[in-house]
C-alpha cells in the first residue's frame, strides 16, 4: 500500500512579534495533527492567515489575500485536490463570521485565544462544517498547547519569543487590542520558566518576553509571593545557557522599581528598552487616555538611565491624532529631541472602528498627517544613524544569529538590537563574540573580531 503523503500547512504571519510566536505555536498544534510546515503556498493542504488589526484597512488586505487563495482553491478542486483556508489572529477576532460571509471559500475562523483547538476544528471542517471560534479562553490555550519538538526549536534558531502576558486593560482611545486580545492575563511562573528552560536546553541563547502590555505581567512566584516582571526576569536569568533577556512592549505606567532594578543588576537583561509614548503633547496624551504626561515619561527615563547608563531607548509615535495642532506636534518633536532615541516606530493615526478615537471630532487631514510624519521620521532617522555612528570603533558583545545574505558573512546582534555583519569565520551561530565596529550601513553595522 502506498503511504499517504504528509499534510502541509502554509502560515502567513502579519503584524507583531506576538503573532510570530502565535504562528509558531499554531505550527506546533498542527504538527501534533500530522502537518508539516511549508514555505511554498502551492504545496499546502492548509493555508492559515495569522492576521493583525492594528493598522488601517487591515481587514480589507486580508479579504484581498483571501481572493487570491480562493482562486487557488478553485483550481485545486478541478484537479481533485483539497485546500482548506483559515483566518486566525486579530482580524479573525474582530470580524468573526463576517469573514465567511464575505469570503465563502474560508473554512475556519479562529481567534488568538483558541488556536490550540486547531486539530479539533479541522476535524469538524473535514466533516463539512464552517467553524468560527473566537472566545477568550486564554488559560485553556496555554494549558493545552503541545510543546514543540527539540529539533523544531533548534531549527527556529538561537533567539526565541516567549509570550508571558496577553491583552490590555489600558483602553487607549486609538487602540483595538483590548477588543481583539481581551483583558490582561498573565501566564503562571512555572509555565514560563519551564518553556524558557526547554528553549535554553535546545540551544536558544536569547529570549524575548512578549506581551501587549508585558510589564503588567504578575503572578505567584515559586516562593509563594506575588511577582512582577522584574522578579520574573531575575528568575529567568538563573537558567543555564540563557545568555540574553529582553521584553516588549511596555507601558510607562507599569515600569516599577523592581523592573528598573533588574536593568541595573542583571547583566543578561539587554540595555535596550522599547517604551512607547505616542505623543509629546499632554493634551493629546489625555485625549489618547495614556494616563501619563510628557513630564512623567521623561522623569521615568531619567530613573531608568540612572540605573542603566548604557541603555538605548526605542519608542512608538502616532501623528495626526484627532485635534492635534501644530503646537501639539511640535511638543512631540521636542520630546524626541530630549530623549534622543536609538530607534523608533512612527505612524499616521488611522481610525479603528469601535474605538473612541474614531468618534472624536477634528480629524487631521491626510496631507497634514503625511507632512508631519515625514518631519518626525527625518528626526528619528537622524538620531538612529547618530547612535549607530557613535558605536564605530567600540568593542561590543555580539550574538551570532544566522548566515549572512552575502557569501562569507554571518549576522549577529548587538545588545541594542542592531544587526552586525561579520566574517563567517568570526564564530559559530549561537556564539557571543567580541567585535570592533568598523562602519555603519543604513540599518546595520559592520565589524571585525576584536
Curated annotation (Swiss-Prot):
Its EC number is 2.8.4.3. GO terms for molecular function: 4 iron, 4 sulfur cluster binding; metal ion binding; N6-isopentenyladenosine methylthiotransferase activity. [4Fe-4S] cluster 1 binds at residues 16, 52, 90. Gene3D superfamilies: Methylthiotransferase, N-terminal domain, tm_1862 like domain. Coiled coil: none annotated. It holds the Pfam family Radical_SAM. Its cofactor is [4Fe-4S] cluster. One of its GO terms (cellular component) is cytosol. Residues 7-127 form the MTTase N-terminal domain. SMART domains: Elp3. InterPro entries: Elp3/MiaA/NifB-like_rSAM, Methylthiotransferase, Methylthiotransferase_CS, Methylthiotransferase_N, Methylthiotransferase_N_sf, MiaB_methiolase, rSAM, rSAM_horseshoe. [4Fe-4S] cluster 2 binds at residues 168, 172, 175. PROSITE patterns: MTTASE_N, MTTASE_RADICAL, RADICAL_SAM, TRAM. Residues 154-388 form the Radical SAM core domain. Catalyzes the methylthiolation of N6-(dimethylallyl)adenosine (i(6)A), leading to the formation of 2-methylthio-N6-(dimethylallyl)adenosine (ms(2)i(6)A) at position 37 in tRNAs that read codons beginning with uridine. Monomer. Belongs to the methylthiotransferase family. MiaB subfamily. This is tRNA-2-methylthio-N(6)-dimethylallyladenosine synthase.
